[in-house]
């Protein structure tokens, strides 16, 4: 189990069998959203200072990549089928990163959204076969709060 400790600039790693706790120090700050690729031993972590999408090897605890990302990231999801990472941030964008191999990632898309829209949900393929990405857009003086729905495509 992985737990963000943003005030300490660390990730706690809890062994569920032994209850031992290890800590991975970070060189980046304000680590908040995380997603796990358990099959390939990769942990994806969004940071605020600076805005990065960091990739960790869960077997060694080493950071293997850190790419510039959306500011004020709140949610981050891993799409195992497409080998993609989706990251929503209050800066007003959804960043999509593509994994080319276990050590290499690149920015695939930077989709404009709405300033302050940073809370998101991605649940993979739904009952009707569509894959949806949901984004909560906060209320403004000229309109109420909304949920924007995106269809994930190859």
Placement of each model-derived feature along the sequence:
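Predominantly soluble domains enriched in secretory-pathway, periplasmic, or organellar proteins
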Residues: 1-154
